[in-house]
Amino acid sequence: MCGITGIFGTADRSALGAMTDSLRHRGPDDEGRYLGKLTGMGHRRLSIIGIDNGAQPIRGDRRDVYVVANCEIYNYRQLRDDLRRQGHHFRTDSDAEVIVHLYEEYGDRCVEHLQGMFAFAVADGDRLLLARDRFGIKPLHYAEVGASLLFASEVKALLQSRLLTPQIDEEALADTAVFGHPAGPGTLLRGVVSLPPGHTLSAVLADDRLVTAVTRYHTLPEAESDPKPFAEAAADLTELLRATVRSHLMAEVEIGVTLSGGLDSTILARLMRDLHDGPIRAYTIGDHADHPDVVQARRLAAQLGLNHHVSILTFQDFVATIPSYLTAAEQPAGLGGIALNVLCRRIGDDVKVCLNGEGADEVFGGYGEYVNRSFRTRRMVDRLAALEASGRPVSRRGREYLDSLTADQPFPHYLRKLFAENMREQLTRDHLELLDASSMAASLEMRVPFLDHHVVEFAFRQPLAYRVDWELGITKRLLKQAVLKTWGDEVDLVGSVLRRKIGAPTSVLGHRERFIRLCDQVLPADYLRDDEYGAYFEQKSDLLVFNLYQEIFVRCRGVLPDGFTMLDFMAQQARRPALSVAG
């Protein structure tokens, strides 16, 4: 797992160097660069497969085709064997090398052959191809600057090129105030775009003008396109998950697992126990030792014989982590993600690779909104009305999204749209981008077996009622049945199935509420009213976090200044000499 950067249209050596250096945390093991006539590409490497000879960029059989990739390709051995039979010559043991040979063989359709998570760039003479995996597990951002295209794994790398000026996109900010993220592929910075999941981007120069085309290569299957009897579907799902976890254990380094005590992480830990002979490290975080997540995780770890590590997050550490968390997240994200950020640093002390249960809620229907259509949309409607009344409308894409979910329609129609929308945007923007940001900030690769495309497509081909029983209010019905049929005699595993979903990350809810109260106490009464962006926010704490985001990304181009602390920033915003917190 790695970080990639590049410039197409002009191979600016200085800008490429600054961009690549800014991603050192994503790849502390090695660095490589390629400079062609029109394309410059950089790579920072975290060595996991092909440790001894997997340096990038990697050249294909043709001398003008190069690839840089941030990837884990789980079927690379089979692909490599097939490509060798077709006459291709491999120079490394890296999984990334199959991409450049697939491109030489199949062109842009090379992505259709890949099982895994990836974001990559192929330089092909005077043409560039960018690609992102089907569900956006790996990030890829780009910006058009004149006749050049900049791309990178992180926004801060684009800013460090010094070729574009960071400016807030107020329409994207309005979207974020309503939905929690910009609607569509845009970001909070004007002109900076995230390549959508399941898409490629091609770029060429025509008469010194940049010409780009974004193309979708993956769509979700229709519900009930390959239905099975419910019991058979549950049994097939268990075997599919077993095969998927086996493929995700591929590495030349030790692999851990996050363990929250909930259903998703429990399944992964249980399958790892079946498939892995050696010791397994499991990691849990909570705000105190008696937190329900910690207690349940301890039970499971003891039953499965895991080497269990528990991190306790204090309020003082919570507050102190906010600046580095936002620097990694590259968005004024909800502070609930701080627990994961801290946990990733702890995991990164021990291992380079970890399995995580992200994606199971979106694939199998794990949120309250899957059984109650107003669970989430009620607040969105209220926020949208407030913003429009103040002359700050959301984007057309944001309005279409909300209209599609609030329309008067039978519940199955609503549910079908919800699954599709959540897989398209919420999963990527609210979860996967933050998971990647926090893990890679700790030089840690997080793997998400529930988002293997075989698992996702299997689930989506089954009837909606298999995943969610909206009449009885049962979420993740198929996934729960798979666990009960397979491990129904294991008490603590059954406990994870029957346990009421209390919502992640519960481990920091108390700290977050305490931080909100602290902001209300120390920030001026007119803090929201007097700020040019105050109308976008409901609470002082939210505006404070946004202003911190501006400090880091607009003023400092994604680089957190040395010695910068959250308490100093709060004191500055509060116009007070100093602040301190306990606990």
Regions found by a protein language model. Name each.
Residues V351-D361, G365-Y367:
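Short acidic/histidine-rich active-site segments
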Residues A235-G256, R346-D350, Q426-L434, I552, ...:
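Phosphate/ATP-binding catalytic cores across multiple sugar-kinase/actin-like superfamilies
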Residues M1-I4, Q160, R190-P196, L210, ...:
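Adenosyl-5′-phosphate
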Residues R63, S94-A96, I168, L237, ...:
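A generic structural signal for residues located within well-ordered alpha-helices
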Residues H89-D93, D287, R378-L387, K501:
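A conserved active-site-flanking secondary-structure segment within enzyme catalytic domains
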Residues A289-C344, G348-D350, E369-R379, D408-L415, ...:
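ATP-dependent adenylate-handling ligase core
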Residues M1-A328, L340:
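Cysteine-centered catalytic environments shared across enzyme families
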